[in-house]
């Protein structure tokens, strides 16, 4: 949710067109511009035992009205590589600080999608989403 909220904020500031960022996508949705963010498989490193991995992989599927607008959003997201963002949020009445580190952006490519209202573009991010402080 931290990553989805951050990406929604970025996209809102990047374009005047309305995009919806969410965890799942359905062709029954009437949304014309959608980015889904889902955890993806990949090599995950941990220090010991059952602690959280140092980083995760997230697949971004970008569905828009043209390949060009999907590509432009993809390029904007690709520019996050190397950035380290600390976000302060309130969760269940408590302040929390979360760290987002964007390490790698792989496989950006157009995807075939049989829904005639939208075209797609997808890529996978390797990034850290980690709670670093809680009140």
Model-derived segments and spans:
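Oligomerization/assembly interface segments of phage tail-like spikes and tubes
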Residues: 52-70, 119-130
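Small/polar-rich, solvent-exposed N-terminal microdomains that initiate assembly or binding
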Residues: 1-50, 84-99, 135
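Short, solvent-exposed beta-strand/turn "edge" segments of beta-rich domains on protein surfaces
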Residues: 47-53, 113-116
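Short N-terminal helix-initiation segments at or just after the protein's N-terminus
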Residues: 1-9, 61-74, 131-135
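Mid-chain, well-packed structural core segment of small domains
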Residues: 66-90
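Acidic-leaning, charged glycine-interspersed low-complexity segments
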Residues: 82-128
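Short, low-complexity, polar/charged sequence segments that are solvent-exposed and flexible
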Residues: 40-43, 54-59, 79-83
């Amino acid at each position: 949710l931290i990553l989805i909220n951050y990406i929604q904020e970025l996209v809102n500031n990047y374009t005047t067109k309305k995009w919806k960022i969410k965890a799942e996508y359905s062709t029954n949705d009437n949304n014309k511009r959608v980015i889904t963010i889902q955890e993806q498989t990949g090599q995950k490193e941990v220090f010991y035992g059952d602690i959280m991995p140092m980083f995760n992989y997230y697949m971004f599927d970008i569905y828009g009205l043209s390949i060009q607008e999907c590509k432009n959003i993809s390029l904007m997201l690709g520019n996050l590589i190397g950035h380290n963002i600390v976000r302060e949020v309130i969760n269940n009445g408590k302040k929390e600080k979360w760290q987002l580190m964007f390490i790698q952006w792989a496989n950006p490519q157009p995807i075939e999608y049989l829904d005639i209202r939208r075209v797609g573009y997808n890529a996978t991010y390797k990034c850290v989403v980690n709670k670093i402080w809680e009140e």
